[in-house]
Amino acid sequence: MDPTCEESPAEDSNNEEEDLDSTKAAPRIRDTPEDIVLEAPASGLAFHPTRDLLAAGDVDGDVFVFAYSCQEGETKELWSSGHHLKSCRAVVFSEDGQKLVTVSKDKAIHILDVEQGQLERRISKAHSAPINSVLLVDENALVTGDDTGGIRLWDQRKEGPLMDMRQHEEYIADMALDPAKKLLLTASGDGCLGVFNIKRRRFELLSEPQSGDLTSVALMKYGKKVACGSSEGTIYLFNWNGFGATSDRFALRAESIDCIVPVTENLLCTGSTDGIIRAVNILPNRVVGTVGQHAGEPVEALALSHCGHFLASSGHDQRLKFWDMTQLRTVVVDDYRRRKKKGGPLRALSSKAWSTDDFFAGLREDEEDAKAPEEVVRESDDDDDDSD
């Protein structure tokens, strides 16, 4: 459990026990849990909805569940599963936290018991192509997307899929759901944002294709905006109910944006191939700073803890890292026209982000990139959205 959530120990009236306790070294409490070192890079990452547990699926097909703590030496592996035959690409906990759903390049869906790590159900050949993403709809329903653009809706109580559609031409990189759990949004390698009505089990539309792969998708601004990361390092914004074309685009100083995770309604974090985890404000569009990095190794996945205090990241360095979100969650960007000084470093937003004498302090955002947030194509209703 996080130190802020732990109850203070009751006072012990026994003087002898107090003397014994005083001889023990007090456990060191860190700002974040210690790094977890794996034997292979993790491509799937998920926090438990209520407990201090982190699940990871790696490229060897192994799935792990860890208990994490800020008390030094207390972060540990609870169990692992090697049932997948190929790379585990995504993991997600059920709403009640009792099940863990995993999908793999081996085309299978696995449902495991969180307490014991036992495989409760295997759906072999769930797709005709390797599965790349999974999204939980409710306690019974889930959606999966594969490498050829196929989307399938499943009810865990039934055998076959409830919905099977293939509107995209390339892999399904990421998916998101509106709060009403009616519309499914899909980011695809074909550069299109897809919209599916899973309540009525029908396809709605595809957006105009962008110049790069869409690698990630998230709802922002209380559902008024949809943000998509791309392989070209650009964040594309869509208005809700205006999915046909982008309303804004925002280029980062990054080769690509491989994953994004919302932190607040205005702020999100991005993971890129340069190993940098950037904090980005949406409308006004600006890189706020850096949360951390994986020493130049690509960032594969990001996840936010149930309490919102920690961001977890996995990289090609085979490490799972934790980052403190406390400072970032207090950031407010309200000066739209202010520009960063030329050659200035990215602002450090956590104690573990690089300092001025660090190797990564050489990373600079030049003036051209500083202008990028302000040189976006804007729809007429964007200013109204930003003022809400």
Swiss-Prot record:
For the keyword Metal-binding, the answer is no
Stated role: Nucleolar protein that acts as a modulator of rRNA synthesis. Plays a central role during organogenesis.
SMART domains this protein is in?
Answer: WD40
Matching Gene3D superfamilies: YVTN repeat-like/Quinoprotein amine dehydrogenase
In this chain, where does the modification Phosphoserine occur? 355
Species of provenance: Mus musculus
WD repeat spans = 37-76, 83-122, 126-164, 167-206, 209-248, 251-290, 293-333
Cellular location(s) = Nucleus, Nucleolus; Cytoplasm
If researchers knock out this gene, what phenotype do they report? Death before implantation of the embryo.
Has the keyword Cytoplasm been applied to this entry?
Answer: yes
**Keywords, sorted A to Z:** Cytoplasm, Nucleus, Phosphoprotein, Repeat, rRNA processing, WD repeat
Residues of the signal peptide:
none
Gene from which the chain derives: Wdr55
Family membership noted in the UniProt record: Belongs to the WD repeat WDR55 family.
Q: Where is the composition biased (Acidic residues)?
A: 1-20
What is this protein called in UniProt? WD repeat-containing protein 55
InterPro entries for the chain: WD40/YVTN_repeat-like_dom_sf (IPR015943), WD40_repeat_CS (IPR019775), WD40_repeat_dom_sf (IPR036322), WD40_rpt (IPR001680), WDR55 (IPR017422), WDR55_POC1 (IPR050505)
Record GO biological process = rRNA processing
